[in-house]
Amino acid sequence: MPVRPCIHFTPPEGFMNDPNGLVYSNGKWHLFFQWNPTGNQAGNQHWGHAVSKNLYKWKLLPTALAPGDDHGLMFSGSAVIDKTNSSGFFESGFFSRKSVDPEERIVLIYTTHYDNRETQNIAYSLDGGITFIKYKKNPILDIKESQFRDPKVFWHEESRAWIMVVVLAQKYKVLFYHSLNLRDWVKLSEFGSAGVLGYQYECPDFVRLPIEGTDEFRWVLIVSINPGSSINGGSMVQYFIGDFDGQTFTPIDSASRILDCGHDCYATQTFGNAPDGRVISISWASNWNYTNDVPMRMKHRGMFTIPRELTLCYTHLNQETRGLVLRQRPVNLHHLYYPDSLPAPLLLNRVCEFPTVWTSATVFYLAVSIPKSIVLESPMEFLCLTWSTTPDVETSKEYFELGYRFHDGAVYVERGVCSSSWKYPLYPERCTSSVPPSSYEDNYILEIEAVVDHSIIEVYLQGGIMCLTNAYYFKGDEPLQYYYLRVPTGASLAKSGMQPLLNNRPHS
């Protein structure tokens, strides 16, 4: 039986980690990824490449970047569409024999890693993103540092320039650079030693997001931490909200916020040039604390989250304070619904079977309402939603459980016993956090959306203001195919349903 996820991207074989070079070009979403095609652990880093028209069904393309004669490894980076040919690569002349469609002028900006040095480099495509030519005058940026990597580049319209954010990983600095041609870069400013430091900063991203219900925007700086996460001691992603004047990022407060409170979300990156100004992200769904050791029953290791649309919104942080947070919602899941299928309502206090198994992933959604008076009378009661491989949910060792306490918003996810044949001391089976009810009026309300796929579950609470992404590795190949939903006495389901999703596996 297959254990490859149905709607989560995985490599055809080998080891995959960070998403790289996410960009939209001429109706296609380009996804590049850190890839070791010859081994099942990190190393021998290449850039793999796939394209999609809907962000779920991916077609593999030839390897985009591979180590060259200097043996430098191809580390993480980004991609842009150079519509105005600022680089000079795309008009008939010195670099190109013919003019390239402005919407297909893809430039990759990436780190080359050597044993004692990391530099920033570029490559460009003259065939719409099928093959890439490394710039002969690389590197474009070399500051003689050994931990200088992961450039994210975007066009900043207000200053009419390209902006690069890149980390000095073990000095806890995010550096901002400016360029008019993608080849020559001038330093603007620094941001750093903020939030959770851990061992190092990695994989920055920098995006302008709308604030829901207003005509305002804020800039969000995303920084990954590894190891030393405040969640699990390993990998995590944090973000800072602020303003950007074309030179300097200024946070609105001193808070560091967590992007995903699960154990398996890292190296979050957003698509450049997305239509309609949407901001869509994908993350690596694993953790450096154990990724090189997780069980392999197929030819690959590594998977990505499903795409998420990002916005900012004001929400309750507790009963007295509202604050600005990131909201993440799954993108276009309704496009994956089976034709003419209707969602099956969720049933309470009984073991129920999924509508389909093996062939697809399943999305669960529910909104639970409970009177405030009942919460105050019984503050320690939990809502529990459990998924299991067997109908004997209470004794199963291969299960996944989500729990929520309305009184204080405490939430936990438990991913069961991984495998009697695989144990790893840095693989935690439970994660905990908190998210307030969406209302503190007469009724407390909890909204849940959970995407259940083979080997991974993504949970979105309160419309995506909290996310918990967790992979799971059971001993057998049986899927999660039963669920049990228990709610506190007096609670009611305002809405509920589960919907099977079309299988989008690109390879077996």
From Swiss-Prot:
What are the subcellular locations of this protein? Answer: Cytoplasm; Nucleus
Entry-linked PROSITE patterns: GLYCOSYL_HYDROL_F32 (PS00609)
Query: Which cysteine pairs are joined by S-S bonds?
Result: none
Q: What is this protein called?
A: Putative invertase
Concerning InterPro entries, the annotation shows: ConA-like_dom_sf, Glyco_hydro_32, Glyco_hydro_32_AS, Glyco_hydro_32_C, Glyco_hydro_32_N, Glyco_hydro_beta-prop_sf
Name its species.
Schizosaccharomyces pombe (strain 972 / ATCC 24843) (Fission yeast)
Q: Which GO terms describe its cellular component?
A: cytoplasm; cytosol; nucleus
Q: Which reaction does it catalyse?
A: Hydrolysis of terminal non-reducing beta-D-fructofuranoside residues in beta-D-fructofuranosides
